[in-house]
Amino acid sequence: MIPLIHQTPRLTLLAASRALLTAELHKPRYFPVLLGAVLPTDWPPGEYDEDAMRFFLDQLTAGGRTAAGWYGWYAIRKATPTSPKTLVGAGGFMGPPDASGTAEIGYSIAADWRGQGLATELVTGLIEQAERTGMVRRLIAHTLPDNPASQQVLLANGFQTMGLDPEGRVRFERIVEPQAL
């Protein structure tokens, strides 16, 4: 079974569940209570929109327990003496790895929390999570050509630029060294 919580120095990464996604989509005032964290004012961030939430919920519903951990992950900044636990971003995988061991990741950080290295830390955590599954051999990611901050996050995490994909996005790849649980 895939671990559904992953810790980094400043973040707790929590795998999305059907209950969390349902609350996020349909009962937003209960979502932070279930999550146990304060929401930023601009939630949801970036490309993590209602369509992404619905996609993750549909995939978790269709895939049952085997789908857990292969879709959305919430990035919660750990409490400090001056601030409570706060949801700062979302990321995750677009599904389990394919037959060759390739999985795709994506991520978004709330505007109020950008520029603090949290996206880099979130991606590091997703890479570590992929390694922990023992199933992923290669990760891919895409950014828009006019998003240098996102490109820097990937480069800082050992991804290499592979050129443009057919949709005009910059494609990145990274080899993963799987580690059995």
Question: Which residue stretches match the model-derived regions?
Answer:
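Glycine-rich acyl-CoA binding loop
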Residues: 117-120
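Conserved beta-strand-loop-alpha-helix junction that forms the acyl-donor binding cleft
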Residues: 141-151
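GNAT-family acyltransferases
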Residues: 1-104, 109-112, 125-133, 144-146, ...
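Conserved active-site tyrosine of GNAT-family acetyltransferases
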Residues: 154
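Conserved dinucleotide-binding and phosphotransfer motif residues
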Residues: 157
